[in-house]
Amino acid sequence: MSIGNIVQCIGAVVDIEFPRDAMPKVYDALVLEEGNDKSFAEKGLTFEVQQQLGDGVVRTIALGSSDGLRRGMSVMSTGAPISVPVGHGTLGRIMDVLGRPIDEAGPIEADEKRAIHQKAPKFDELSPSVDLLETGIKVIDLVCPFAKGGKVGLFGGAGVGKTVNMMELINNIAKQHSGLSVFAGVGERTREGNDFYHEMKDSNVLDKVAMVFGQMNEPPGNRLRVALTGLTMAERFRDEGRDILFFVDNIYRYTLAGTEVSALLGRMPSAVGYQPTLAEEMGKLQERITSTKTGSITSIQAVYVPADDLTDPSPATTFLHLDSTVVLSRDIAALGIYPAVDPLDSTSRQLDPQVVGTEHYEVARRVQQTLQRYKELRDIIAILGMDELSPEDKLAVSRARKIQRFLSQPFHVAEVFTGSPGKYVPLKETIRGFKMLVDGECDHLPEQAFYMVGSIDEAFEKAKKLQ
């Protein structure tokens, strides 16, 4: 337990000098000593060692506000990395990056503490899965189905519905799924964390969820490490042989926190100002989110896309690690079609006839072909109008517009705003509905009948009312 002194403080990055023979190791946790009186610095502020500069000086990130720090303050080395409580004591609780409770419900009684930096499971321990995870959301189940124990990314710019989609997935999967969930709020709005907590509480599944938050207002050190804290809790449940759901909102803020810290640590920036270690940091996190022979982690991650540019280094690096990508499009949101999932841009490794079956695969591909044809004809329609199209093309456009509307769906979590009850559509119903559409069995129905309904039977009922 060596003691050092602060020698320099620049924002969240603090240099601390220790005796040369007692320098802390990289990733060790250091704690601000209590005896630093007359300072309004955070009590028990934790630092994480990032670099050893030599001569006994280490460069650290403060995991908390660095306000009130000054040179000469004494800091104690703990001799170990940051460790957080794991296990059943964390369920139903809200914690910060260090695993401290922030829900004012007393201390967390955990049977074990684990370091947040762990190695990814070995290759021979991994267990690939091909079982489908039904979400009840038509467009996702049809075009980009999820795998149990797979990794899913929800990509979208600002305000196209990533968080609402994630809340609906939590509503449909976490409530039906009898297992445990871990939610990591990384650099998002505190209001959304609050909404999530109340959503879980009202539906009586709070005792199956562990929540870890490092929100927008927190220093970059917290936002950088909070994803690892949540993941460490999920890994413990997985190692017990359970099937875990791990939600992260938002992976982009994890990258952004890394960028802020990287600049303060004096590293040379790479493309678009990102940290040079972007791929490594993302890989370290994503390779740990995996299913082993003992248990599985199914992870659903929201990914903010800066300026709607999917080629930006941050979303582009995230793409590499995922099994399914759900791309939300501003153009579709502008048409009033929610969820605003782009069925032509979204992909899934599960969409394979050997996994989902021939019928599902063929229906999904025919739906995509019809929508693609409509996309190609849109310019001609804009210039010359519908009358100039051949009868086959007119039919394709008519079907595509119906398919486009049938891909919309009322959400349970949006009932409060829309006033229409949410719909959960089983996979068989989804396939049956879209098969009828592409086979031309619904050509006589008006396209309004397909907007914001659940199954195809509801569309027929709505059509009767419209006549």
Swiss-Prot record:
GO terms for cellular component: plasma membrane; proton-transporting ATP synthase complex. The keyword Transport applies. CDD domains: ATP-synt_F1_beta_C, ATP-synt_F1_beta_N, F1-ATPase_beta_CD. It is a peripheral membrane protein. Its EC number is 7.1.2.2. Keywords: ATP synthesis, ATP-binding, Cell inner membrane, Cell membrane, CF(1), Hydrogen ion transport, Ion transport, Membrane, Nucleotide-binding, Translocase, Transport. ATP binds at residues 156-163. It is an enzyme of class 7 (translocase). InterPro entries: AAA+_ATPase, ATP-synt_VA_C, ATP_synth_F1_bsu, ATPase_a/bsu_AS, ATPase_alpha/beta_chains, ATPase_F1/V1/A1_a/bsu_N, ATPase_F1/V1/A1_a/bsu_N_sf, ATPase_F1/V1/A1_a/bsu_nucl-bd. Produces ATP from ADP in the presence of a proton gradient across the membrane. The catalytic sites are hosted primarily by the beta subunits. This is ATP synthase subunit beta.
